[in-house]
Amino acid sequence: METGSLQGTRITRGFERERPTPRHASACPVEEIAAMLGHRWTALVLWHLSTGSKRFGELQRCLPGVTRKVLAERLATLIDHGVVTRSQAASFPRQVTYQLSGRGRGLVSILDQIEDWARQPH
């Protein structure tokens, strides 16, 4: 068997080929969203986008301490989950903005409820 044919698969103990798992393979959608939100900066990116669309540099200035690499990764994940959209204007210089999708606005309203719950006295 060619080595190249194994790309994207995993060999298990019995040497069977196992199909690659999809990027979002969680059986529980709550677990999937909790995992996404569990990454540092993700909730803050959502919060800042809840006030309106932002360019990459604007977001980075709103989040002191976040690196360009991490911010790009968080935005890519949020776009991949359909929570954020990326728009590019046909202008020079290129103007890219990020904004919440309808799904993202729904998620922010849930995060607002979680914040209200967290602020209640114990």
Go through the PLM ranges and name each one.
Residues A43, H81, I110-H122:
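Alpha-helical linker/hinge and terminal dimerization helices associated
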